[in-house]
Swiss-Prot record:
Residues the record marks as site: Transition state stabilizer: H18
Family from the record: Belongs to the bacterial CoaD family.
Source organism: Anaeromyxobacter dehalogenans (strain 2CP-C)
Protein name per Swiss-Prot or TrEMBL: Phosphopantetheine adenylyltransferase
Cystine residue pairs: none
An annotated Gene Ontology molecular function: ATP binding
Amino acid sequence: MNRAAIYPGSFDPLTNGHLAIIQRGLNLFDRLVVAVANNPQKSPMFTVDERKALIREAVGNDPRVEVDSFDGLMVDYARTRGIPKVLRGLRAVSDFEYEFQLANMNKKLLPEFESVFVMTGEDYFFVSARLVREVAVFGGNVEGLVPPNVLEALQRKLGRPPRT
């Protein structure tokens, strides 16, 4: 059986929480498409291509993980790819409220669409890409919250020498 799901997000930047969701997703599905959303209404720190490259490097050569990007509605991307399942990570009850609304809207737009929710690891309940960006911009240490390659990319992007 070839069970696949899409794990969409902005991943700006990829965090260890995202990696935990990818790992949990691989326990549920044969294949994951990590799909980087290109949202023109946001001003990302990293370009779509940079985010895709950082994700590829962080997941290594796992043949079960494909990294892609999309514009527009995720359900349209899911329809185009023929993958009507989405994997979403939850950290808190507040995440569920938003994700529940989104899942129902997606189901309305694409009736065969299914959302699968998994909890992130307890070490990452508080971690969000937005928070990581904010802490990094103000000079805080985000080591342990992001993969090593992302930490290096953040340091380069912000013009800071790597910590030793």
